[in-house]
Amino acid sequence: RLSIFISDLIKGQNTLHYLRRFERLRNAPREETEAYRFVRLKELLIHCERNVPFYRERFREAGFSSVEFSSLEQLRQIPPLTRQDLQDRWEDIIATSYRGKRLSAGSSGGSTGQPVTYRKDSHATSAGLAAHLVGWSLSGWKMSMKGLHIWGNPTTVNEEWGRVSSKLKARVFRHHKFPAYTLHDGSRLNELYELISGERYDFIDGYTNAIYHFADYLKRNGLSFNHKVKYVLTTAENLHDFQRRAIEDA
């Protein structure tokens, strides 16, 4: 908890607040969590219709009324948000109440081609990290564990990882980083192997395909570690059975 408190101070966020809320909901009866979800979703839809030009237009075209929303089935009326929408209409997707306020840019990993950029405020960043931590805790992961993050597209690595706040956060959480997009280079695969061997990480997390590619490299080259990584957490891409077996065997 102290590490999250320190990270919040460094980055001007409120992760601890959301973490407490999500942990309470995680242990609450299903009926309570479903009721909470519906109330919050309706509030969000009303906010979007009143304050977000893109969604005001989309709801009107779909014949959808946020005020009359009463069933999850009604969401089928709204066309899905696409990558093209995010790229072409990003200014209209920002709520009018947030125009001129400080927003940070985030981006997708770019694993399907061109990364998609989006904007978020400190509340979104804090809530996202809190949800991330609660999700990991379901696997048995603990915040005190030392980990390696195999992640990042060139934009994220070059623009975000070098920031002082990002480096301090990594130190506080004992969470090192390795750029996933460089693993097409055989020398970088060996560099990653030597890093993990030397640092003796408790867990590794990152893109499914990047971690599978590394596991396959270990197998093909007859490489192994002197210590066992306790957890491997994959994300952003589907984990197929053959990939799971390869990662477990490595």
Give residue ranges: language-model regions:
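Nucleotide 5′-phosphate-binding alpha/beta core
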Residues: 1-107, 113-129, 133-146, 153, ...
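A generic structural signal for short, solvent-exposed coil/turn residues
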Residues: 110, 139-141, 170, 249-250
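Conserved adenylate-forming
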Residues: 43, 153-250
